[in-house]
């Protein structure tokens, strides 16, 4: 089985106009999407399309009305980049826990033929599926890597800078841009995101995880360690939102509630492959990014 489990930590830091920080341990699934129909066989506590301790449902992921998830992602990447993934398409996500899930972001790592994610290879394309709450809108960014060489510590790092096209948090406005960094080294994975407005950093988030085997023993160990991960994620979102409100963080309305001639309303509404690669970031930022309304 190619699918794996990921364990590590998440950290969020709000820098401006109020300061706020938290971190927590987490467990996630790294699913070879071609194993969608068979991965649940690893444990009686894991099911497909039905209730269990952990489960997967097709409707939670990219283009749920198109059937096979792997094919849907490959079709989209081909449309967005002209290259059809001929290797593994790996989904990084939280599964459902007792029937519930909320993923602020799920990643699809698209590899070339013969490449193994466990070797720390950089995927040729990364698709980021963003979901906001409580609206549950979805948006996709398609990131094209350039094939970074390893540094002295063995990390291969890809950097992207692009304009924000989707309302995620009521505590972040739309007039912002992102710097995303993906670093790969063997079983280790790091993802870092900066949120900036002009030259000022408002927020950053970091995910640091390590790959572990996806077998019955390790799944059960992870469930003991992270028994209610999906509930923890969404409870944390609302708890820290309350704390931000009490600290006086400014509140931004959903763009759909704004006049249609407002720039915040227009951003993202008509995106269908728009190149949003930012010119505001430094010369270390590389890789093309396109934005897709879904």
Q: What are these regions, as identified by a protein language model?
A:
Residues 1-294:
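Mature, function-bearing regions of proteins
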């Amino acid at each position: 089985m190619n699918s794996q489990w990921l364990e590590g930590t998440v950290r969020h830091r709000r820098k401006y106009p109020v300061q706020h920080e938290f971190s927590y341990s987490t467990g996630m699934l790294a699913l070879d999407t071609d194993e969608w129909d068979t991965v649940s066989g690893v444990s009686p506590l894991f099911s497909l399309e039905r209730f269990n301790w952990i489960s997967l449902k097709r409707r939670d992921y990219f283009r749920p009305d198109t059937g096979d998830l792997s094919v849907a992602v490959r079709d989209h990447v081909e449309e967005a980049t002209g290259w059809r993934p001929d290797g593994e398409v790996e989904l990084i996500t939280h599964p459902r826990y007792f029937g519930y899930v909320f993923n602020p972001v799920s990643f699809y790592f698209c590899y070339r033929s013969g490449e193994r994610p466990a070797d720390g290879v950089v995927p040729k394309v990364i698709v980021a599926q963003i979901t906001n709450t409580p609206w549950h809108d979805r948006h996709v960014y398609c990131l094209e890597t350039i094939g970074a060489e390893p540094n002295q510590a063995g990390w291969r790092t890809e950097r992207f800078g692009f304009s924000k096209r989707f309302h995620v948090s009521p505590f972040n406005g739309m007039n912002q841009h992102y710097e995303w960094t993906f670093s790969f080294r063997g079983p280790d994975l790091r993802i870092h995101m900066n949120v900036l407005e002009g030259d000022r950093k408002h927020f950053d988030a970091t995910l640091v995880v390590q790959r572990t085997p996806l077998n019955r023993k390790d799944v059960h160990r992870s469930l003991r360690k992270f028994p209610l991960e999906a509930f923890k994620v969404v409870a944390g979102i609302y708890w820290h939102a309350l704390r931000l409100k009490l600290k006086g963080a400014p509140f931004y309305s959903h763009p759909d509630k704004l006049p249609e001639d407002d720039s915040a309303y227009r951003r993202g509404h008509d995106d269908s492959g728009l190149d949003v690669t930012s010119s505001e970031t430094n010369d270390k930022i590389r890789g093309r990014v396109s934005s897709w309304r879904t």
